[in-house]
Amino acid sequence: MKESNLSELLNRRLALLGERANLSLLEQCLHGIERECLRVTGEGRLAQTPHPEELGSALTNEQITTDYSESLLEFITPALKDPADTLASLDKIHRFAYSKLGNEYLWSPSMPCPLPAEEDIPIAYYGTSNIGQLKYVYRKGLALRYGKTMQCIAGIHYNFSLPEQLWPLLKQAEGFVGTDRDYQSSAYIALIRNFRRYSWLLMYLFGASPALDAGFLRGRSHQLEQLDAETLYLPYATSLRMSDLGYQSKAQAGLTPCYNDLNSYTDSLRKAVATPYAPYVEVGTHKDGEWVQLNTNILQIENEYYSNIRPKRVTYTGERPIQALMARGIQYVEVRCLDINPFLPLGIDIQEARFLDAFLLYCALNDSPLFENNECGNATSNFLAVVKEGRRPGLQLQRQGQPVEMKEWAAQLLEQIAPLAALLDQSHGSDVHSKALDAQLAKVKDSSLTPSAQVLAAMSEHKESFTQFSLRQSQAHAEYFRSQTLSKEEQAAFEEAARKSLEQQTELEQNEVGDFDVFVGAYQASILAISN
């Protein structure tokens, strides 16, 4: 590969990290995965049962919780150095969950099963403590603002951090004037800018939602095509989940946090959680004496902002995400645009994780100029073009104001990511990252190898609707997890964690002091009180 293709900055950083004294640093990256999935009946319909008590408390269990709906499970791994260990942890959580699910299944793809009427989709319930009620009212607000149907879409979140010792090393080499914390935050914001530039590539390579159940759109007008009586699709789509049919929010339309620095990012979110939005004001926070939303602002809380990647910092009890970021800077990023691959029991595999590491390292170490002119808008339109028609032959994207063929740009990007994969391999003493990259290059050369193409091919081969295909995959994965149970010790550890979480919730509820209305007021004030 010609080194001249890489930026001077990237070459310098590659050389520095390739030095013997620094090489082991890259083994210290941390990886965490969150996987959402709907609980469904044997007929592939939404399970209307409460969150199984044997899985513990959705409020306090660190590994098994619920997302939007009582029927939408979320599995959370610890952050580990080797993504193979992260996936092994996710696998064990699935096996434990299946030991308690009775005759229910975990729905394998991102797009939901046929859903009941909006009012019959149960909102996740977290008990009577103030924090539990806050989570519940927040979800009521989401239903009011966006409808419940959209909230039933599931995804994979990939949490990734570079080693803390890496930043002072780069900072010193580059003569950055300022604190280590400021350098680290600006480097993560630079990663996010590059992610915005290049994340369309992930949608082509890993998008796996080209079709959905026809009832999902609830009769709204759309540009999708009919595949069969029960299925809508787009022939060249990679990820309808990430297209504009997924989340449409007029309120959030004007909210495009600028990723120029951490301050401007937290600033725009702070304004959004403190700025009233007329249609929400009209509804108010209460109806018939009951809370219906936490407030009438553009965002109820900062996590309501919908984005493909988020800067993150672990929060202390009672602390808000913005407070943590402003106080202690960025600690890791959360990649939120990955579809669940319905052919994989976990929805993601080690090859995808190894490639993501190389891709994110490329985003972190490559030049990342500030967005200028219409570059931010182009990043959004490139992303939307690929999710809707990424496999269309000859598809063109915009690069620095010029049209470029997507496949040509994809191949060039993979060529530039190759030295990062090689560096990771050198650090780990293996060739797994380079092999993962080769597998992605094969998809660029042949679009039939992409998961989105394979979903449509499988449905066509078996003459199945989206729901029939998805149920078949869900049943196959259930068999996979149930065929190999956890060891007695592992099962006992999960059961103990579930039991402890229920005790914690009870304790929270019994020791609760103070009125919920006052609690919400204090929660609101905590944002307004932050001064730059």
From Swiss-Prot:
Give the first-level EC class, as a single word. ligase
Work out whether the entry's keyword set contains Ligase.
Answer: yes
Which keywords has UniProt assigned to this entry?
ATP-binding, Glutathione biosynthesis, Ligase, Nucleotide-binding
Show the Pfam families listed in the entry: Glu_cys_ligase
UniProt pathway: Sulfur metabolism; glutathione biosynthesis; glutathione from L-cysteine and L-glutamate: step 1/2
Picking any one GO biological process from the record gives: glutathione biosynthetic process
Q: Which GO terms describe its molecular function?
A: ATP binding; glutamate-cysteine ligase activity; metal ion binding
Enzyme Commission number, as recorded? 6.3.2.2
Q: Which NCBIfam families match?
A: glu_cys_ligase (TIGR01434)
Under the heading InterPro entries, the entry gives: Gln_synth/guanido_kin_cat_dom, Glu_cys_ligase, Glut_cys_ligase
Protein name, please?
Answer: Glutamate--cysteine ligase
A Gene Ontology cellular-component term: cytosol
UniProt gene name: gshA
Entry's family note: Belongs to the glutamate--cysteine ligase type 1 family. Type 1 subfamily.
